[in-house]
């Protein structure tokens, strides 16, 4: 019997240490099966003078004379308990503990941890409500020790009360569902920070690869316009496709240094595969343009191609492949731009960005394809890197708004030629612009949907696209490579 009944209380007073020991042993708790006298003779003598009320305000370890536990001080033991439990009444020199034991907290009455009840089950109910996993956070300053069941019980009850409060607190989303007829201001969603602060950037990056997962809305098939070059000037960078799988950078340099000094660029190369080309192709960057000419002269090619595009092949070997033909794709600088009407003024607002271009597609061919599909093409340009080699994207300008919108609406076009088949992606060409909503912040995000078709800053994007029916819009951003390209 842990607590005496009311009849016994008047004659015996508060329980002594032996009664508490028997009660705690009946709970089958670890560490309570030993007599208290084995801890310390001095501390056991002092512990018998403590009352049950002092145990509620102090850790059990202090009552037993044990070193203090290394828990963080919990404020609810001081202030929260005073608010939740009525203050004990003073009767002479004794404190009556029955009001505390009979009191209830403000948590639901059906809860197992809603407070203490009268009788000998008080501490047993409290112990049974403890949550062992996950434990309450604490700082161990002395290397660990026994946990305070009273503090853990109060912390468990506080967690349930906070969860109950969160369950009844209406959120903006639940408010809009509860009253569907009410007009909810779009800035409701702005009160909650997005889970990922770069979610717009992530969506914009994903959109750049949209051609790989979307179906083409229209198809162009035919023969590319012929190419006639007179003393062409090449980029110092060439594409090398179909290289041996076991080739190394040193092997490439040894093979091609006979044409001049060069370096090797391996797209996708990382520390896991430092020896082999991860994608089966590399780029060779020569110091001089004449080195590219010498390489092309050493290649086998077919100059009688119907479209005038010669395919160059070079034979090389590796450690495990004695002879392998690799394809060499150079780039003529004149293929980077095509102007149909030199006197026509180019309007950036009627310019589209074309991505996922094939390496054999030059500016003139791109202009011819989009002019056949949409009409009104006056300019086409291929984006290049610092070596003036294509990076797989381009720009096309129209002379009328109708053709421009038709191209933007098409979005994905499949190009079929005798040499290759490629699906390209068409988006509005983006410039540096202020936000079209607030006109005070830069607008790096563009919405290509015809309902919006504006530049947005981050805040205005979240505000605008929090409205129902606009959340599916995909953002566009300028690619950093396009900023550095010429």
Curated annotation (Swiss-Prot):
Domain RRM, first and last residues per copy = 236-328, 350-431
Residues engaged in binding Zn(2+) 1: 435, 438, 457, 460
SUPFAM superfamilies for this protein: RNA-binding domain, RBD
Going by the UniProt record, its keywords in alphabetical order are: Activator, Cell projection, Cytoplasm, Membrane, Metal-binding, mRNA processing, Phosphoprotein, Repeat, Repressor, Ribonucleoprotein, RNA-binding, Synapse, Translation regulation, Zinc
Output compositional bias ranges, type Low complexity.
102-120
**Could you cite one Gene Ontology molecular function of this protein?**
mRNA regulatory element binding translation repressor activity
| PTMs per UniProt | Phosphorylated on serine/threonine residues by AURKA within positions 91 and 122. Phosphorylation and dephosphorylation on Thr-97 regulates cytoplasmic polyadenylation and translation of CPE-containing mRNAs. Phosphorylation on Thr-97 by AURKA and CAMK2A activates CPEB1. Phosphorylation on Thr-97 may be promoted by APLP1. Phosphorylation increases binding to RNA.
Which InterPro entries does the UniProt record give? CEBP1_N, CEBP_ZZ, CEBP_ZZ_sf, CPEB, CPEB1_RRM1, Nucleotide-bd_a/b_plait_sf, RBD_domain_sf, RRM_dom
Where, in this chain's numbering, is Zn(2+) 2 bound? 447, 452, 465, 473
Tell where it localizes.
Cytoplasm, P-body; Cytoplasmic granule; Synapse; Membrane
**Which residues does the UniProt site feature Important for the positionning of RRM1 relative to RRM2 point to?**
331
Predominantly, its location class is cytoplasm
Signal sequence, renumbered to the chain: none
Report the sequence similarity comment from the record: Belongs to the RRM CPEB family.
Q: Which PANTHER family match?
A: CYTOPLASMIC POLYADENYLATION ELEMENT BINDING PROTEIN CPEB, CYTOPLASMIC POLYADENYLATION ELEMENT-BINDING PROTEIN 1
According to the record's subunit comment, the protein's assembly and interactions are:
Interacts with kinesin, dynein, APLP1, APLP2, TENT2/GLD2 and APP. Both phosphorylated and non phosphorylated forms interact with APLP1. Interacts with TENT4B; the interaction is required for TENT4B-mediated translational control.
| Entry protein name | Cytoplasmic polyadenylation element-binding protein 1
């Amino acid at each position: 019997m842990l607590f005496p009944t009311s009849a016994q209380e008047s004659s015996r007073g508060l329980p002594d240490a032996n009664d508490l020991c028997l009660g705690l042993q009946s709970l089958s708790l670890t560490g309570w099966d030993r007599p208290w006298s084995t801890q310390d003779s001095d501390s056991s003598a002092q512990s018998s003078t403590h009352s049950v009320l002092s145990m509620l305000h102090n850790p059990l370890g202090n009552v037993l004379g044990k070193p203090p536990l290394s828990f963080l001080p919990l404020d609810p033991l001081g202030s929260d308990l005073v608010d939740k439990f009525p203050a004990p009444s003073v009767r002479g020199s004794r404190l009556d503990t029955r009001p505390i034991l009979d009191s209830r907290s403000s948590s639901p009455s059906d809860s197992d941890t809603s407070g203490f009840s009268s009788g000998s089950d008080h501490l047993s109910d409290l112990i049974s409500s403890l949550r062992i996993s996950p434990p309450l956070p604490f700082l161990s300053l002395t290397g660990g020790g026994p946990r305070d069941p009273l503090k853990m019980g109060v912390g468990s009850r506080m967690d349930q009360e906070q969860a109950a409060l969160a369950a009844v607190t209406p959120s903006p989303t639940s408010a809009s569902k509860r009253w569907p007829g009410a007009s909810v201001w779009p800035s409701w969603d702005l009160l909650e920070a997005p889970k990922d602060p770069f979610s717009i950037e992530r969506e914009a990056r994903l959109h750049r690869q949209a051609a790989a997962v979307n179906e083409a809305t229209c198809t162009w098939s035919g023969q590319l316009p012929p190419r006639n070059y007179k003393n062409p000037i090449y980029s110092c960078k060439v594409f090398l496709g179909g290289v041996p799988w076991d080739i190394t950078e040193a092997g490439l340099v040894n093979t091609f240094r006979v044409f001049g000094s060069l370096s090797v660029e391996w797209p996708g190369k990382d520390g896991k595969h430092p020896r082999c080309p991860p994608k089966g192709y590399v780029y060779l960057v020569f110091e001089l343009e004449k080195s590219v000419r010498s390489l092309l002269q050493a290649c086998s090619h077919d100059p009688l191609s119907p479209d005038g595009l010669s395919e160059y092949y070079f034979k090389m070997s590796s450690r495990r492949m004695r002879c392998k033909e690799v394809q060499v794709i150079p780039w003529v600088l004149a293929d980077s731009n095509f102007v149909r009407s030199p006197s026509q003024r180019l309007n950036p607002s009627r310019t589209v960005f074309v991505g996922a271009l094939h390496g054999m597609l030059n500016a003139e061919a791109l202009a011819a394809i989009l002019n056949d599909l949409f009409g009104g093409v006056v300019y086409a340009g291929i984006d290049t890197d610092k070596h003036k080699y294509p990076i797989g994207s381009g720009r096309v300008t129209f002379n009328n708004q109708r053709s421009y919108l038709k191209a933007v609406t098409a979005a994905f076009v499949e190009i079929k030629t005798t040499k290759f088949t490629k699906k390209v992606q068409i988006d509005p060409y983006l410039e540096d612009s202020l936000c079209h909503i607030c006109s005070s912040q830069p607008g790096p995000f563009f919405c290509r949907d015809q309902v919006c078709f504006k530049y947005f800053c981050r805040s205005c994007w979240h505000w605008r696209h929090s409205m129902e029916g606009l959340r599916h819009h995909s953002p566009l951003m300028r690619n950093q490579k396009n900023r550095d390209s010429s």
